[in-house]
């Protein structure tokens, strides 16, 4: 009998040891799994960050995948020149060359079929080229804060000769610059520094926020994207609302949300390149009338940073990790994401009592 008991005890001890081992392995695996939630107002650069993760942590875009973006590049280019030409009427800007009025009519006649077919035919690219070279069109482009225009407009239009080639294949940079509105939730997986990342890009959900926000209670960190350059723009869906104010409102609701009490908040003040260019001729007082500093990059950017960080109501227990980013610059995103990962590792160790 004694032998039987000791054999059973031995088996139970083995089982207990195995359970402990499995629990430890599960715990280690869970500690290595990082759920990242990408949030921010529309057109703040969230999807570009996701594309950068594919370039940096996977193998980038294959030639075939790049080809599939050709129609998007054409559509973005056509939509951009159309937006500028349409705005000329509203802003009462004339073409410098009266012949461009015919080109404008041609643009609207040809663009619909071209977009449907995902093409950029020679006659249409010629029309776009002549319009873009017109001084009146350029004058209207310089006033783009007064209407809705893609950030990538000048990038594509200045490179029309290249993208209009019959054998054109988009580059990784062309793909990064494409704009497709995100609807629903896009999930991306990758491994970095022995961590398994799951990144969720939540887009197009302005009115439904209350319904889905609690689903992300267990996320490791939130990356909140803000377009610095949007300080003098209004929303596409609400022309009364300044885009920066909308961003601040959203950040306030996320940063101080009960579901995210223990979640690291990482703030990406994005589009720093566009902001640096714009701040010299479009004053920050458009967005913040109380601002008395210089319209220079460093001072104005620091002011915006403090406006966002001041929204944190739990400063004593919650830190905001802020980075200035240019989502289309792979090296910059790589450097920043490296720093972000170190923060996540440090916080994970802290949670496990190892730091």
Swiss-Prot record:
Membrane topology listed for this record: Lipid-anchor
Tissue specificity statement from the Swiss-Prot or TrEMBL entry: Ubiquitously expressed. Most abundant in the lung and in the spleen.
A Pfam family reported for this protein in Swiss-Prot or TrEMBL: G-alpha
Keyword Manganese assigned: no
Superkingdom of origin organism: Eukaryota
Chain residue ranges for the region called G2 motif: 174-182
Keyword Plastid in record: no
InterPro entries found in the cross-reference section: Gprotein_alpha_I, Gprotein_alpha_su, GproteinA_insert, P-loop_NTPase
A single MF term (Gene Ontology): G-protein beta/gamma-subunit complex binding
N-myristoyl glycine-type lipidated residues: 2
One cellular component term from this protein's GO annotations in UniProt: cytosol
S-palmitoyl cysteine-type lipidated residues: 3
Binding positions (Mg(2+)): 47, 182
SUPFAM superfamilies: P-loop containing nucleoside triphosphate hydrolases (SSF52540), Transducin (alpha subunit), insertion domain (SSF47895)
Residues that, per the record, bind GTP: 40-47, 176-182, 201-205, 270-273, 327
Family matches, as Gene3D superfamilies: GI Alpha 1, domain 2-like (1.10.400.10), P-loop containing nucleotide triphosphate hydrolases (3.40.50.300)
Chain spans, region G4 motif: 266-273
Region G1 motif, residue ranges: 35-48
BP terms from Gene Ontology: adenylate cyclase-inhibiting G protein-coupled receptor signaling pathway; cell division; cell population proliferation; G protein-coupled acetylcholine receptor signaling pathway; G protein-coupled adenosine receptor signaling pathway; gamma-aminobutyric acid signaling pathway; modulation of chemical synaptic transmission; positive regulation of cell population proliferation
Function statement: Guanine nucleotide-binding proteins (G proteins) are involved as modulators or transducers in various transmembrane signaling systems. The G(i) proteins are involved in hormonal regulation of adenylate cyclase: they inhibit the cyclase in response to beta-adrenergic stimuli. May play a role in cell division.
Family that this chain belongs to: Belongs to the G-alpha family. G(i/o/t/z) subfamily.
Subunit structure: G proteins are composed of 3 units; alpha, beta and gamma. The alpha chain contains the guanine nucleotide binding site. In this context, interacts with GNB2. Interacts with UNC5B. Interacts with GPSM1. Interacts with RGS12 and RGS14. Interacts (inactive GDP-bound form) with NUCB1 (via GBA motif); the interaction leads to activation of GNAI3. Interacts (inactive GDP-bound form) with CCDC88C/DAPLE (via GBA motif). Interacts (inactive GDP-bound form) with CCDC8A/GIV (via GBA motif).
Protein name: Guanine nucleotide-binding protein G(i) subunit alpha-2
Organism: Cavia porcellus
Underlying gene: GNAI2
